């Protein structure tokens, strides 16, 4: 489903834990990381699409999370020319996304990247709130920044307010890597951080 302007309706999902960290997922077979996201099907509301994608991509159900906040407007990004499919009709030039901030209410052991026939991700870790804005592929960076700015005042842990604007980088240093096998950091700077902990 592509709109009149060439954008595909989509949802993006930021999953936070009680420490104020967010789930950062590694794309299957790649050294590329992003938040869970996916298209909205015909007849589906953004919230229904979010719950479907949440299960398909990370194995969580509506019982495992609670919605903290949903973005008020569509956020758009254009695809780079190298990713455009010029032969498709109508042609998709990018994504327009509704973003959801959800809090993980169940055990993180319920996270499962293999709930669909074609998994999107093969690893994940908890990172600090602003870390993904600096690390995501460049053409998604502006949308991530806008979504995270909108979510910043809603992020909290169980007992106290978390300040996502903090410059404390301890969350990245202590990032938990998870997958079937222990995940080794993909960048030299992450390797250095891991050895300092």
UniProtKB/Swiss-Prot annotation:
Signal sequence, start to end: none
One GO term (biological process): mRNA catabolic process
Keyword S-adenosyl-L-methionine: no
Pfam family, one: NUDIX
Segments crossing the lipid bilayer: none
One term under GO cellular component: cytoplasm
Gene Ontology MF term list: mRNA 5'-diphosphatase activity
Keywords of the record: Hydrolase
Domain Nudix hydrolase: 6-149
InterPro entries, per database record: Nudix_hydrolase, NUDIX_hydrolase-like_dom_sf, NUDIX_hydrolase_CS, NUDIX_hydrolase_dom, RppH
Domain of life: Bacteria
Named cofactor requirement(s): a divalent metal cation
Motif, Nudix box: chain positions: 38-59
EC code: 3.6.1.-
Region (Disordered): 165-197
Entry's family note: Belongs to the Nudix hydrolase family. RppH subfamily.
Protein task: Accelerates the degradation of transcripts by removing pyrophosphate from the 5'-end of triphosphorylated RNA, leading to a more labile monophosphorylated state that can stimulate subsequent ribonuclease cleavage.
HAMAP family: Nudix_RppH
PANTHER family referenced in this protein's UniProt entry, alphabetically: M7GPPPN-MRNA HYDROLASE
Protein name: RNA pyrophosphohydrolase
Gene of this entry: rppH
């Amino acid at each position: 489903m592509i709109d009149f302007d060439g954008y595909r309706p989509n949802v993006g999902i930021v999953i936070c834990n009680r420490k104020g960290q967010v789930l950062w997922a590694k794309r299957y077979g790649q050294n590329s990381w992003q938040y869970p996201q996916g298209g909205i099907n015909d007849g589906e509301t953004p919230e229904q699409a979010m719950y479907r994608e949440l299960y398909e991509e990370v194995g969580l159900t509506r019982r495992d999370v609670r919605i903290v906040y949903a973005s008020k407007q569509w956020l758009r990004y254009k695809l780079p020319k190298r990713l455009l499919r010029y032969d498709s009709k109508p042609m998709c030039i990018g994504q327009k996304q509704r973003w959801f901030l959800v809090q993980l209410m169940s055990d993180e052991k319920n996270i499962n990247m293999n709930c669909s026939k074609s998994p999107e991700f093969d690893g994940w870790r908890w990172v600090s709130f602003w870390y993904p804005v600096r690390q995501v592929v460049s053409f998604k960076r502006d949308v991530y920044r806008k979504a995270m700015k909108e979510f910043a005042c809603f992020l909290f842990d169980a007992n106290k307010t978390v300040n996502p604007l903090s410059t404390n980088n301890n969350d990245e240093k202590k990032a938990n890597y998870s997958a079937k096998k222990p995940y080794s950091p993909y960048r030299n700077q992450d390797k250095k951080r891991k050895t300092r902990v």
